[in-house]
């Protein structure tokens, strides 16, 4: 995979950002980000390819095709990253794309993550209750204080029962909600699945830089 990705970059085989019609296909920044992850995983500080990983991260973060984590330019609020009206925003470097509308390209994750036996109050169709948020993950969010918006974006801790007209707050009521959106058919969600994000590469770059040259002000 190292040779394949380096060859793609050396020969300029991918554009810096795909045209709208091809959005979702891997572009040059996706290739750089993936190669950086490979080098960061397989090598260590002192290896040339470890330093290469840091350089690749830097190039991605400086690209006009993605949001700038230093200035905030072209980035969006966390709750908008996963919004189906804002897909492939500049926080997203690479994602698995889905399309609802009964065309065979819908996302299954809304149904997979919804609470079992929720009576279609969370989503239409079969619900599997996978990836149920634990007490530990809830605590990890709340320990960061009320300003951490990710908890409410990522996790629902209750749902409304339209039959009883009451909130379900006990038992199997928690679920990962950021991939849940209204569907008319089960397993036919619209939400894309981000695979590589700007925040991901910014954190990787910080880790690599710290390992290579130590912390800086």
Regions found by a protein language model. Give the residues of each.
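Tetratricopeptide repeat
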Residues: 1, 5-8, 53, 60
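Short coil/turn linking the two alpha-helices of tandem helical-hairpin repeats
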Residues: 38-47, 211-214
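Flexible helix-coil transition and linker loops at the boundaries of alpha-helical arrays
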Residues: 13-24
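Elongated scaffold/linker segments in the mid-to-C-terminal portions of large proteins
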Residues: 23, 55, 59-62, 66-213
């Amino acid at each position: 995979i190292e040779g394949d990705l380096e060859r793609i970059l050396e020969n300029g085989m991918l554009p810096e950002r795909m045209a709208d019609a091809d959005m979702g296909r891997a572009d040059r920044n996706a290739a750089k980000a993936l190669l950086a992850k490979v080098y960061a995983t397989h090598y260590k500080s002192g290896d040339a390819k470890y330093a290469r990983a840091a350089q690749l991260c830097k190039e991605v973060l400086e690209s006009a095709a993605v949001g700038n984590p230093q200035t905030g330019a072209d980035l969006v609020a966390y709750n908008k990253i996963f919004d189906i009206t804002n897909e492939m925003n500049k926080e997203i470097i690479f994602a698995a794309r889905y399309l609802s509308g009964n065309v065979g390209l819908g996302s299954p994750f809304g149904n997979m993550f919804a609470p079992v036996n929720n009576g279609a109050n969370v989503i239409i169709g079969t619900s599997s209750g996978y990836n149920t948020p634990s007490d530990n993950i809830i605590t990890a969010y709340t320990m960061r204080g009320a300003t951490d918006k990710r908890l409410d974006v990522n996790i629902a801790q209750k749902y409304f029962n339209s039959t009883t007209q009451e909130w379900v707050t006990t038992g199997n009521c928690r679920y990962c909600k950021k991939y849940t959106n209204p569907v008319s058919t089960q397993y036919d969600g619209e939400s894309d699945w981000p695979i590589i994000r700007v925040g991901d590469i910014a954190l990787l770059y910080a880790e690599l830089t710290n390992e290579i040259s130590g912390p800086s002000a």
